[in-house]
Amino acid sequence: MAIGLAYSTQAATVTHTITVNPTLTDWSVTNRVPQFDQRLGTLKSVQVTINANAAGRSEYVSLDRNWQLPVSLAVTNAVSARVGTLTASNSVTVSGASSVAYGVTNVETFAVSLGRAVSTNRNLGVFVGTNTLPVVTSATARTWYSGPGDFSLRWDTRASAVATVAYTFESNCDKDKDGDKDGDKDDDKDGGGR
């Protein structure tokens, strides 16, 4: 399992990114990201995002000469990213049905993309400080079969994911600029009155 961590800063936003390369499901990994440093300014909101790609295949073989009726297969892929009080999660189910002859290997493949973003501007205290926060990223696959007879069934499912934690804030630099502007106006008014 390969995991990557990245950090970027844009205007009034600090974003931490966690990447998990395609890995056999189920999996769950815990990484840590820094809390928001209040020396940068005042934290206004936090957003957690999860984007994932899941793919896999099933191999079904009928072992019963007396049956050639439709069989149904399904797989539900789910991903989530949890940090602090926020959890971003989503799931997608892929299903299909086919008639399978005795002794023939029936192969089905699937590929899905799924994601979710959640944010909050309340109770931000847990996200502020000089320590780190655990980010738990996970992916699961749940499979189902419905049909008659004896059979052999094998599933292979994998998922990759990118989780981000974004801090949006009012920077101290912006506050200083506003303060300077107000100060200049006061000076001009004082000067004009002399």
Regions picked out by a protein language model, each given a short descriptive name:
Residues 1-4:
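Bacterial N-terminal signal peptides
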Residues 63-95, 163:
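Extended low-complexity, serine/threonine- and proline-enriched intrinsically disordered segments
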Residues 175-181, 185, 189:
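Asparagine/serine/threonine-enriched low-complexity, disordered tracts
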Residues 99-156:
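Cysteine-clustered segments with highest specificity for TGF-beta superfamily mature ligands
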